[in-house]
Swiss-Prot record:
Residues 622-726 form the SH2 domain. The gene is Vav. This is Protein vav. GO terms for cellular component: cytoplasm; cytosol. CDD domains: C1_VAV (cd20810), CH_VAV (cd21201), PH_Vav (cd01223), RhoGEF (cd00160), SH2_Vav_family (cd09940). It comes from Drosophila melanogaster.
Amino acid sequence: MASSSSSNSFGGVAGVNGDLWRECVAWLTRCKVIPPDHKAAQPDAEIRILAMTLRDGVLLCNLVIHLDPSSLDPREFNRKPQMAQFLCSKNIKLFLDVCHNNFGIRDADLFEPTMLYDLTNFHRVLITLSKLSQCRKVQQLHPDLIGFNLQLSPTERSHSDEAIYKDLHSTTTDNIACNGTGYDHTNTKEEEVYQDLCALHRTSRSQTASSTSFEQRDYVIRELIDTESNYLDVLTALKTKFMGPLERHLNQDELRLIFPRIRELVDIHTKFLDKLRESLTPNAKVKMAQVFLDFREPFLIYGEFCSLLLGAIDYLADVCKKNQIIDQLVQKCERDYNVGKLQLRDILSVPMQRILKYHLLLDKLVKETSPLHDDYRSLERAKEAMIDVSQYINEVKRDSDHLVIIQKVKDSICDIHLLQNGNGSDLLQYGRLLLDGELHIKAHEDQKTKLRYAFVFDKILIMVKALHIKTGDMQYTYRDSHNLADYRVEQSHSRRTIGRDTRFKYQLLLARKSGKTAFTLYLKSEHERDKWRKALTEAMESLEPPGCQSTDHKMEIYTFDAPTTCRHCSKFLKGRIHQGYRCKVCQISVHKGCISSTGRCKQNPVSVPPPVCDRQLSEFNWFAGNMDRETAAHRLENRRIGTYLLRVRPQGPSTAHETMYALSLKTDDNVIKHMKINQENSGDSMLYCLSSRRHFKTIVELVSYYERNDLGENFAGLNQSLQWPYKEVIATALYDYEPKAGSNQLQLRTDCQVLVIGKDGDSKGWWRGKIGDTVGYFPKEYVQEQKLASEEL
């Protein structure tokens, strides 16, 4: 029988035992702390999902607040502990304290905090919840709320439970979705609010279909424009119908706390909607995709908004609770806005929902756009840009929550000032908290094993000792710290060790690279040991990324104060803590995964004068300066076939045979061709080429040659020359000019137009131009410049 029970441990064990955890889920659903469609409530759900949902203690604290709002101040527990053990344990302790003091649950019916966090005895957790569901106070406060009962015989507990919960502990890992906050429910509600306020109504779409012959692509464009208009109405309402009336009762600081960056969002989206509508007009100068690309950076303000949103809702609730006039005014504003159907706290969530919709709307538009359509490639880039923005916002929000955790770590260590590393007590310099927990440690020069609580950050391992711990409180005294850059992790022998505390049996060796000292860490299980080894190894790898072996850049993990893009891929470095890496020499900034592609380090590769030309490249209209592939493609995609530019590659050369330069050309098959310029050492001089077929003394000579000859000798099938510089200066001839026979000069006729290719001979009175297919020099005094074509065309 035990074998049969064990085999069904997560899908539902036979008998009462198999139903117990599902009955607990059903009760939590009746309490409305998890929604009916929660993962744990699905028919194929496993018990581990419930365990991980409860593990951080957030849902448990929300549960007792739901059962009795006076039992716990919501500000006392950590709503986003991000699985930091000391914060999760604090939440669990608070829950147990409320169960005992407020609901009268006996100590014998309470579980120990480690039983839940370590998942060593989840059965006891279910017992506590069962007792809570049936206690007298809950029945008095919620007479219609049916609890759940636990009735197991000793035989069933000794066989079924032991097998189930041992298996639960050994198989449940930290990468399972584990938030017990009811976020799924919150997100569902926020999505419903967004749909109610911003989404297109079906009647509107059907009316359009009945009156106009629209393609599916047109529907998607209309959905984007109309939902944006609806969203701007929501922002405007927040500003005028809520902030406006409240201005008479709250000061500006209080308004900023409740309505973070709302005024700025109104301004941004007013301009954004105008640009979107303008992009749909005939002969529009800027297309829709470019509008999204242009607003890529302004949209980063949502990182701050989303980070402040939860605090805004809390502050609003606190103000309304303390001030009846404010509370009544807010309710009046809600009635005036939408007949009271939605609360202000619900409406405040709409901006976060909207910013995360843009890449989805663009994805729909891309799918409804033919790959042969002129806008296809630019729409794909716009979609990728909005995905990048969404990821940036999510990481800023996550790191903002993490900064709170770091501050709580600092507050929990009473003498953190004893740290002797870096700036002492400023924990922010050490990066994110990767792992924390209890372990034993033994220095090899000191045979005494010590019980410690440890915090692993990106850069440092901090050892503390627990002080007298009250329920719901965690305080430590500082003992030691180790810069992880000085260490490596080694697996000690795999045999379990037996000491005075038999809980800590599994070893991990932390050895100094200098070989002078080493420490042995003792953990409770193989799973714990593997978790600590992984955290320490990842931290050390982040300090010395493998990609650094492929370049001579002096990279260091770095926290950037302002939004920064990666020099290699041009995407944002995301978050607020250690977003990426910066070279200590040339200051370029990159993602960890892009380090190996950064090429050779130069003190300042952009400002160094081009070493390959006998004249300044900036004198030529085809020279674009520092520019990545994506930007070059955007500059050229809507230009005529044969338009080209020479650019400095931001990442620099990746091999000794590459230069920092590349040509980008719009070809006759409507594709942007990017061509690296290579170099070869020829005795005392350097030669430049696109391939080994032909070499030139300067890059100017190379460009000049391929202006007159196609590139097919280097690239099979590319029967295209460099025809039109991307900066087009048009000049009109004022006089006739007849060049000498056999010279490299242009013939001019009064009023004829010349495309000015370059002004490299300006000091001598000559410009270089093109008329038709003929390229040559002409006297600059014989012409008058007309216009400079926009680089954005």
